[in-house]
Amino acid sequence: MEIISLKRFILLMLATSSLLTSNIFCTDESRIPSLYSKKNYDKYSEPRGDLGWEKERSLTFEEVKDWGPKIKMNTPAVNKMPPSAANLPLRFGRNMEEERSTRVMAHLPLRLGKNREDSLSRRVPNLPQRFGRTIAAKSITKTLSNLLQQSMHSPSTNGLLYSMTCRPQEIQNPGQKNLRRLGFQKIDDAELKQEK
């Protein structure tokens, strides 16, 4: 098994090295062996016959007259500045004297990081309200957690916790005494003594 994998590894290394060396030597065109000489290459690269794209189309005087009004009609549309180009920097051909849009400048401090509290309160919605919960839910969870902490020390809660955690282990090992159960009973007894 090791000999076969070693042979494959050697073959792989030889193949990659030969490919890499062939690419290195073939980068220079003077070293590439070619079937055609440069003379033949020039002969085949020249276009043959009369090609359609070489013909130049001549415009008549009437066609030039027709194009004149069309160009004049389209120039105002070309010269109009779109609203997205209103804030382009000066290097794109805008002059300093041109009046800039004040609507975009009104939000500039928010973009630069000033006024963060206002921008965050506007842009990020209150998640409990978004999912249909209100601030009263916080108070309800606090009262429930307080009740849970108070009831944790009662014996009925300890029995419930024990039944939730230890019952699967008793089912798996019915013949053995459960050491975990004994540990919980000792802890429960100690807590009851401390409460009294």
Curated annotation (Swiss-Prot):
Protein function: May act in concert with kisspeptin, through opposing affects, to regulate the activity of gonadotropin-releasing hormone (GnRH) neurons across the seasons, leading to an annual change in fertility and the cyclical seasonal transition from non-breeding to breeding season.
Molecular function terms, GO-annotated: neuropeptide activity
Assigned protein family: Belongs to the FARP (FMRFamide related peptide) family.
Keywords per UniProt: Amidation, Cleavage on pair of basic residues, Neuropeptide, Secreted, Signal
Coiled coil: none
Tissues expressing the protein: Expressed in hypothalamus, where it is localized to the dorsomedial hypothalamic nucleus (DMH), paraventricular nucleus (PVN), and to neuronal projections from the PVN to the neurosecretory zone of the median eminence.
UniProt-recorded name of the protein: Pro-FMRFamide-related neuropeptide VF
